[in-house]
Amino acid sequence: YGWDVAVIPNRSQDLIREIDLIEEIARLIGYDRFDLNLPNPIKPGKLSSEQLALRRVKNGFTENGFNEVLSYSLVPEDKETLIKISNPLLLETSCLRNNIWKEHLEIVNRNIKAGQTSCYIFEIGNVFYRTTEIIQEELLNGAIFGNRKFGEWVNSGKDNDLNYYQARGKLKEALSCLNIKIDDKPTDSIDFLHPGRTAKLIIEGKDAGYFGEIHPKLIFEKKSLKKVYLFSINVAILLGASTRKNKWIPIYKQYPVVPKMERDINFVFSRKFLISDIISQIRKTGKNLLEDVYLIDVFEDIKLGDDYISYTFRLSYRDKDKTLHDSDITSIHSNIITKVEKSFNTKLRN
């Protein structure tokens, strides 16, 4: 329109991009002066594959007993290297957060003080940090506390809290709607998590986040806190793995018409070995008739030693054409036991 635009000096900090100036002009001249013509042609709107996957994630968590929370992305300045905003209204909201777990821990702590016996929460939000430039990263964060199976029931004076494997299973169930594989890699590099009960979450070979129990020092600092598990997953990596074009191609298998045969095996392993590696070895050895293998029990005791732990696996055998007998699986089952003993320097427990 041939206008001359002058920016008032005390407003110039709000005007950085071209679109900021366009919005300012629109506000000043009045939105009623814009044409009401709709774009032509009008196309029907639809959700993208990423948006659909994100909805599945939220539904998966709520269906598994989690509550979605929204925490404030503006935080007060502290000793950490936070990104300051140029025009804060309050000192308490003068910086952009670089994590979400602290607020989630406060939410859990408030619930514990209020007498709640469990608290399962999740949030999809942004964090901000600076490398050579300002980075905005979208994360799926959450916290797990307490065992909803028991509620307020007193279990003969025993601790009703979830153990590490049960809590990790809760996260696995919530994300099962995406039908992706998430591997766990033990780590002790996250300072606010327990060094022996923390794992990096690996998706398609990428470091996507973490899952772990809070560090004992946090429980000591906040007297009311108890055993809490925190998790964080990069949303871009999560959605990227779940929206591959070949991910949702249906594959149909014939329903089995013959029964399966199950056998349990129990070994004492050094803690340095990963369960995923053990299961992979079992699958590889028994691939002809072995249909499935999964962990059913974990046992820790001082008699085993501090560096050792007992795992029990359930193996399912099935032949698609006939009912199996003991003699059909004896050789394969024995071979699996021998291979596990040799590969992981262990012995079968009676």
Model-derived regions, located:
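Extended, well-folded interaction surfaces typified by the phenylalanyl-tRNA synthetase beta subunit core
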Residues: Y1-F122, Y129, S316-R318, D328, ...
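Long hydrophobic segments that form regular secondary structure
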Residues: Y1-V5, I112-G115, I121, V127-T132, ...
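Short, hydrophobic beta-strand segments
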Residues: G2-S12, L36-S49, I83-L90, Q136-K158, ...
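A glycine-rich, aromatic-flanked flexible loop/lid motif
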Residues: I25-R33, V75-E77, T132-N147, A241-V258, ...
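A carboxyl-terminal module marker
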Residues: V154-N350
